[in-house]
Amino acid sequence: MSADTKTQRLIPMGVLKGAHGVRGEVRVKSFTADPDALFTYGPLMDEAGKVLLTPITARPGKDHFIVRPKENLQKEDWDALRGCLLHASRDQLPEADEDEFYFEDLIGMPVYTVGEEPEARVRAVQNFGSGDLLEIEIPGAPATIYVPLTRADVPVIDMAAHRIVIPELSLWANQDEDDAS
């Protein structure tokens, strides 16, 4: 693994679903909005940056793609990799439109309320089944808080200025304290 691979940001783009038959093909589920786009990002890697799958060809299956990979593994080897996430390097993805963003790009962004000084930062973007949530770290707070990633709760995500505005951040922080009592 090169030094570049160690520092690159990897984005989960799909998942291996195991072997397809005995001729070396594999089943892959795409997470991308345009499922075919998964195969335009070059070799797909595991979370450590090691190349797992270099697609040569891909054809649609029922809820997945059947891929002929460059890698020559046995059926049992591909089946052992079932469930492994396939990542692409962030720099391989197209730039988001002006009013769009990648969740990965929100991580580490400062969070403002009304002032000019950041009051928190985004630790992660989570989804526990009921919608996307920003996991927010507030300096000195005992735990992170979760804020729904909606226009009502997060009215400003300014990628150019590298800032997120959550005017009611204190309400979310206080809600966690209310739940504990």
Swiss-Prot record:
Any one GO cellular component localisation term in the record: ribosome
Domain PRC barrel: 98-172
Compartments reported by the entry: Cytoplasm
UniProt entry keywords in alphabetical sequence: Chaperone, Cytoplasm, Ribosome biogenesis, rRNA processing
InterPro entries reported in the protein's UniProt record: PRC-brl_dom, PRC_barrel-like_sf, RimM, RimM_N, RimM_N_sf, Transl_B-barrel_sf
Pfam entry (one): RimM
PANTHER family, per the entry: RIBOSOME MATURATION FACTOR RIMM (PTHR33692:SF1)
Subunit structure: Binds ribosomal protein uS19.
Purpose of the protein: An accessory protein needed during the final step in the assembly of 30S ribosomal subunit, possibly for assembly of the head region. Essential for efficient processing of 16S rRNA. May be needed both before and after RbfA during the maturation of 16S rRNA. It has affinity for free ribosomal 30S subunits but not for 70S ribosomes.
Protein name, UniProt field: Ribosome maturation factor RimM
Organism encoding this protein: Hyphomonas neptunium (strain ATCC 15444)
Gene: rimM
